[in-house]
Amino acid sequence: MEKKPESIFINRELSWLDFDSRVLALAKEKTVPLGERIKFAAIFGSNMDEFFMVRVGSLYDQTLLKNNKTDNVTHMTAAEQIAAITPRVAELQAKCDKYFQHLVSALAQEGYKKVDFAKLAKPQEHFWKTYFQRELLPLLSPQIVDSRHPFPFLNNKDIYYIAQLHSKNEGISYGIVPVSSQFERVLFVKDGETTCFAFVEELIAHYAATIFSASTVQKQCLFRVTRNADITVDEGMMDHDVDFRDVMSELLKKRRKLAAVRLQFWPDAPQEIVKFLRDKLVVPADRCYTQTSPLDSGSLFKLAGRISGDGGHTALFYPAAKPMQAPAGYDLYTEVRKHDVLLAYPYQSIRPFIKMLLRAGADPDVVSIKMTLYRMASDSQIVNALIAAAENGKEVVAMVELRARFDEQNNIDWSKQLEDAGCTVFYGFDDYKVHSKLTLITSRVNGQYKYLTQIGTGNYNEKTSELYTDLSFITTRQEIGEEASAVFNNMALQRLTSEADTMLVAPLRFKTVLLEEMDRQIALAMQGKPASIILKNNSINDPQIIDKISEASCAGVRVDMIVRGICCVRAGVPGRTENVHIRSLVGRYLEHSRIYCFGSGEAMRIYIASGDFLTRNTERRVEVGVRVDDPAIAKKLRGILDLQLRDTVNAREMQPDGTYAKVRPAEGQPPVDSQMAMFGYFQNGFVQETDKPEKPKAESKPKAAAVKAAVKPVPRQRAALRPKRAGLLQSLFGRGKK
């Protein structure tokens, strides 16, 4: 019997959990400072929350359908995927509990001792009981569940205390006490040279029985509910007489009440209570987990933050590393007219970009500023710069994606403020999320329109620009500006951009271009010429791209992939992906930039983009990228890739079985931390040229053609009347988000 060829595909959900495993591994990595290890444990917990809310929630929805479709990569049904991820989640949670105990022990050696409420001495017992009675008890809202009192609604990600009660008159009932999210999650008390810390839910659980003094508490525990957060916009909601913000607001209300998909319990949770909650919330046994680590990992961020704030513990955290500021007198708005500019976050500050927006908003030659907005800071200076421009009389067009998951409300709020300032706000496509990072500043000089275009890999968010690695390419090349203008015009008219020369625009001109680039490398390899592909992004599961990568490998093309998260292609499979080398970088900063490089030397073609290689990016989103033709910047981008391929600190390399092994330095060689090395790499990144001649004018390209998206009506677009101008400072600092 002929042996079945080994699959090159990995299930998306299992690959997501593999990424979470790599994050969790840093919680035990001894080369990582203790305070940072606590944060990685917290990040792991936050990632698991999202995994259940989004992925398990979606799979749960699919199991309810009669036509149970399969995963397009591994062809597993939703039920099969849930069955596969269940033991993996349990394994990871057990590791997290083990690492948490190690962290607690290590903290004790540093003078931070966790309170064990089962072993309190009398003075401590008196202190904590008094604190509970004075500070917490008046704010608690206990609820009884019996024949006369229905089971209450339990909020997503909130912690609850539950007790099984018995009284002579009423028999068995249950008492539930919400642990208010308004409470300080971690409490700190000095005890001599030691700082004691306690999780507030454990304190409440220790004394909560006193609330139900009329009954006998037979059993008790803490638990936490995770609910499905996978909301979709139905066709019936696309009534264009209704403001789309109202639709999203209603969906957000519905999301709060979606089905429970996970229950977390204290260790040794009584089975009677577990069964009671399972029955009430309709959660199967395989999605109920007990854990010794905090039920809400967010409290670990609070713990690390307090230790950092105490001072004197610098060795417990990464050395300070702030984004490099531009030199005095550096003016990006002027500089980009002399040469293309690349900014790399978090190594360089985002401030020059913000100042560029402010300069444009005050420039009398500027006619309009257009920008796509996906995830914004809650107190966004970037959005305030747009508001200031509108109040200065500029036409400001903001494409706000209201469906950015978990940022919907923030985006709704900002869209209202933009509209109030006189900006034109529209919400993109019915069927495609707009995930692009695109800014276009249009000026009219001597009767001609001139463009300044910015294309990025990351959000317009000052906060995350210090945490995520991203790239921002800024140019005044006329041909790129014309293509960007066509993209904005097409989006406003609900049309998809299908033609461009330098830009990539998903879903019609993103995957096709990159597949053509791979085909060129395959053709070179078939001719015996040097050929190479380097792909850096966050995730990949597009089967068409995976098949092309396999084809390239079989043709002899070396394919290097730097994929931080989900990776559904298996490296090193004989006869399929032997020439594919995959690594994941997980470290101090979240790797977020996307760089696609084909060939080397003078023949090299290199792109940056907002989109990954997930099918949702290549086929169901409007993504934007650009081929970088500036030789100096192209070389800089290639240098980033080469440096990351040499990393021996943050890198883990995929093995042929799909597992990852930590990359270690060769014997006698120093470790290479590509993230920290970037600070040196971009040390002179703010290039100033005072005497460089202007670039020769490129021939004007025909405007990008567009194909109409299937059955697209007039866009949801509103433009409020322009209010009176309020002045720059007031508009920047007087409009804090409510």
Write out the residue ranges for each language-model feature.
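N-terminal localization/anchoring segments of enzymes in phospholipid and broader phosphate metabolism
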Residues: 1-533, 551, 555, 567-738
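Hydrophobic alpha/beta core scaffold segments
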Residues: 558-562
